[in-house]
Amino acid sequence: SNYFGTVGAVALDQKGHLAAATSTGGMVNKRYGRVGDAPIIGAGTWADEQCAVSATGWGEYYIRLNVAHDICARVRYAGDDLAQASDTLVMQDVPALGGNGGVIALDARGNVRMPFNTSGMYRAAIDAEGKRVVAIYRD
């Protein structure tokens, strides 16, 4: 395993404000001075009034594609829904460059999407009615 300890969160409050946060221990045996995607706004984390995203994965590819921001930009400017935007980036664009990982994403309507292209990704969600989703693997 090359990844160690990424934690991310996205939230939508009662007033409709979206927020995202990402923290990570980074890659094992990373090169001294390497900066991954987690602290880079747009690559590992992004939130605006349409969408919030926290990402984990091979940072160089997430930086190159500006993954978190691009998901929200596709929702805002291309008219993609959250599922289409996040699935395209995570399942097609990142792997096409050789990277892997996943995201947790939330839109202003409360839709949640958590795609990943690895064997598993720890993830959970809860909605306003208290419905919970907790998972590691696809099913």
Each PLM stretch: what is its role?
Residues 1-139:
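N-terminal nucleophile
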